[in-house]
Amino acid sequence: MIAARLHAVGDLRVAAEPDPGDVPDGWSLLAVTSVGICGSDLHWFSDGGIGENRIEHPVVPGHEFAAVAVTGPYAGRRVAVDPAIPCGHCEVCRLGYHNLCPTVQFAGHGTLDGALQEYLVWPDHLLHPLPDELSDDAGALLEPLGVAIHAVGVSHLRSGSHVLVVGAGPIGVLVLQVARRCGAGRVFVVEPLEHRRATALRSGADAVWSPEHGAEAVLDATDGRGVDAVIEAAGTDAAIATSVAASRPGGRIALCGIPSGDTSCFPAALARRKGLTFAMVRRMNDTYPRALALAADGVDLDLLVTERHPIIDAAKAFGAAAERRGDKVVVEVSSGSGGAAATPEPPQR
């Protein structure tokens, strides 16, 4: 089979690799169809890791993906795949925080190979059948939609709350759409790139601004009050500063963006005077059923896909994503037919 493996910073190599071996009980062999490139993938590609986690050996990236099940209970069906494998039995998992499991394995991060390969095996309970009306790309993007759902939950958004989204990359735009469906009052967006501001407007933002005057514009639009909730999806200190300045006293800021380094700074005096609450967003937590329901309800996932590349051009795809010249870059691994799929032939071993 063909796989794309990250060897070092900027060194993504596509090569033939052995097909998967025996499939354990409770797992399925999958033929990968579509893989979205996430901002966290770019941290591994451009920075060599995230926080204290670094590339220790060559790894196959990719955690936003859809596939066709070759074996197992969903054989012949297209599936979206939850990329996180928590242990399920530690105290954190028993409390329901599967996304915070200290020993979680996550596709394409650390030691577990991800989806930029033609075949892989995955636990059956993490597979979610796709309805015919959702494309393979949409199936892959259920993962970032799940992150957006989790981020909105962490923000404690209530019906009628005014919301600011800082950063209109794919996560930010999905946060915007989820906030709308959760009954938000007005939803504002601050984003530096013009084409992403345009995407935010098409996705239902009440107003969008560039960062230079973003906080001031939010305060003007709310008669000096500020917003009830901020979801920060940019990962920069400037974005956090905008979040603090635009928040109302007693407001809540959900930090979803991942910084390039391992530290973030914010205006402490202003945040203290406002009595702001900061909450960290860690991936998602059992959100696939809700993501599927929201996609069926009209959250537009295909809108975000602005560029596609075959797996043989995976390095080119990562370069395009790093340049941020569009919204979402997708790697096409194989065809799942976009609807009901026939069972692919198992790879020859």
Where are these regions (language model features)?
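Glycine-rich beta-strand-centered segment in the early N-terminal region that forms part
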Residues: 20-35, 50-91, 131-133
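C-terminal hydrophobic helical "lid"/dimerization subdomain
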Residues: 1-3, 241-244, 285-349
